[in-house]
Swiss-Prot record:
Source species, domain of life: Bacteria
Positions that bind Zn(2+): H70, H74
Similarity section: Belongs to the SprT family.
Pfam families attached to this UniProt entry: SprT-like, Zn_ribbon_SprT
Protein species of origin: Staphylococcus saprophyticus subsp. saprophyticus (strain ATCC 15305 / DSM 20229 / NCIMB 8711 / NCTC 7292 / S-41)
Membrane-crossing residue ranges in chain numbering: none
GO MF assignments: zinc ion binding
Cellular compartments annotated: Cytoplasm
Entry protein name: Protein SprT-like
InterPro entries: SprT-like_domain, SprT_Zn_ribbon, Uncharacterised_SprT-like
SprT-like domain location: 9-149
GO CC annotations, alphabetized: cytoplasm
Amino acid sequence: MIQMDNSALQKLTETISLKYFKMPFKHKAYFNKRLRTTGGRYLLSSHNIEVNEKQFAKFGESAIIDIIKHELCHYHLHLQKKGYQHKDKDFKRLCQQTGAPRFCSAIEKYEDRVNYIYQCQKCASRFPRIRKVDTNKMVCGKCNGKLKELNN
């Protein structure tokens, strides 16, 4: 398997920034092993970009390129004092111009992460959940029936 270290990621980020945005990337890009639910993130305070190492391991360099493009959209817009958030028109426009995706592929499917399954005692609907639910407070969203935890 091909490996990519932080220096290769830095070089790739600088190259993508010049190629797609026609502006230099003057900060740091590095892998963060602690990222779990996101492909990468742009840090507003330091202007650095962190990338989820597991994305490279599972999906390869093309996924990393897409993540870098997305984070560079945040980076360049923030430095230009334009709308850098997902909801902003500037961000959506720049993502479209550069071919940066709005989201990346999930590393694990939701079904694989499910730890609890609840069933409505009234309509028998099943609800897979990652986190435990307080069955005294939560009710079925379809019929307002009482939920019961099933043993996996």
